[in-house]
Amino acid sequence: IVFVTLGADMNGKPDDARLDYEIVAWSESGASYSINHGSIGTFIPREGANGIDRERWTYHHGMERSVWTELDKIINEPIPTDSGHLMQIMTSGIDCGYLRDYAYQYIDSKDFTIVGLKGKDTDKFTMNMKDAKSFKQSLEKPNLYMVETNLTKERLASKMRLKWNDKLNVPQPSGFMNFPTPSGGKYLFNNYFSHYEAEHRILDKTNTFKWEKKNDMVQNHLFDCRLYAGVVGEIMVARVLKELKITNGTWKNYCDIVLDR
């Protein structure tokens, strides 16, 4: 594993917040491993005869049950590996397209270890350009990046279609996505994998495309979280290669640097 990232998606309202997230590990081969997913806050009322309302979280800073305090705990929690050593989340990305001022206050305090992400041209049809970057730095803030949403979702969908047979003793293809065995109520279809089926690609007559939800009832938040976890890793790699003055750098270049080869 080369590094671990986190992607987060803001939902709800300032005083009734839910922040969804996914933690993903990225291997030298290009395969990824989902480590955990979850939500800070919920829109589901507590069950029971008394109908007690759920505990509500807030996007306000410095208040009780602020999502930002809880997110700090999640990001700073060490992650055990199979070899016995601990890893930390290297970088995180938060969707700032909604309730941006709350998110900006948070990312501005993190010195680029956590950056903001915004979808770009989400409603426009896009050409599938293989060499196009998935992001560009925003003119608004140095720690905010504009994500080529349709292009990035297209690439994520391609990775979702990859197949691998573990009985053939061959490496996993680059981009292959690994998921834990469902346990503890996580990684089930209803609360996780259904999010990956919530959107579809729409083609127009010129063979350009865009991605959008199949209908207003479906939930796509964890699909977005996985997308953000991938993009923020690409951003970090690009920043490191730029600082080292490596032009047209690749994932292999980055791995060689961090693995001291």
Could you describe each region identified by the protein language model?
Residues 1-115, 153-261:
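RNase H-like, metal-dependent nuclease domains and their acidic two-metal-ion catalytic environment used
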Residues 108-158:
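Conserved beta-strand -> loop -> alpha-helix junction used to position metal-binding or nucleic-acid-contacting
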